[in-house]
Amino acid sequence: SSAASDVYKRQLTGGAMMGAMMKNDADILTVQIKGNGPIGSMTVTANPKGEVKGFVGNPQVMLPLKDGKLDIADAVGIGVLSVIKDIGLKEPYVGDTILITSEIADDLTYYFANSEQVPSSVGLGVLMNKDNTVEQAGGFIIQLMPGATDEFIDKLEARIKEIKSVTAMLEEGMTPEQILEHILGDMELDILDTIPTKFYCNCSKDRVSKAVISVGKEEIQKMIDDGEPIEVNCHFCNSHYTFTVDELKEMYDCCTR
């Protein structure tokens, strides 16, 4: 639905930018939003290479327009935003914050300030076609570096308050570079690198089989007793994986519990 597409693309865009901020190629960042609204929970996973994937709990949610616009906050509802950073340590870092507006950008800004103690401004927007498909999505994350002067901070805050919405900038055909130039105005801008983004799912039959094994011997035995192949679907890319009874027996033998 258009509501699910709008909310999901905002989260995908934010997640892609946050993933690009991770340091090592093997690092993985996940942004989860769990609200009590009709859209259900949403998950986005990204890495520093610009690869991103995600899924929506209820992609078919239909909501009436509010003042002629989609009401993102109503779709998401009240809930929690979680950011999970897997950087190869024994346990991943997990930061949880409440959803303050449920409009994604404000919630990510709040997360950065409260969980990472980094003053930030996040803007996100989605440009929809008349047939409710997404034409493009975009956004920005601006963070202060240590040593920023009060004068610079005041100037930046004033500028952010007066800029157009990201959706309006996309509608005007602005590129990411032009969006940054528009936001920063006469403040100095140096572009150090650009990273193309793309949807990428790393699921495979082997990875899915490990997930099946993780349910334990008792559950796998029930599947074997049914005497029929099982089909497992990937939430992220909707790929289908079929396991025969013989394959289930092999997975049963691999179970440790």
Task: Report each predicted region and the residues it spans.
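Short, small-residue-biased leader/transition segments that mark boundaries at the very start
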Residues: 3-8
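Predominant activation on well-ordered alpha-helical scaffold segments within soluble catalytic domains
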Residues: 12-16, 105-109, 209
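Glycine-rich loop at the start of a catalytic domain that most often binds anionic cofactors/ligands
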Residues: 40-49
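DNA polymerase sliding clamps and clamp-related checkpoint/processivity subunits
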Residues: 50-54
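Hydrophobic alpha-helical segments and helix pairs
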Residues: 55-117
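Short helix/strand-capping turn motifs
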Residues: 92-95, 105-187, 191
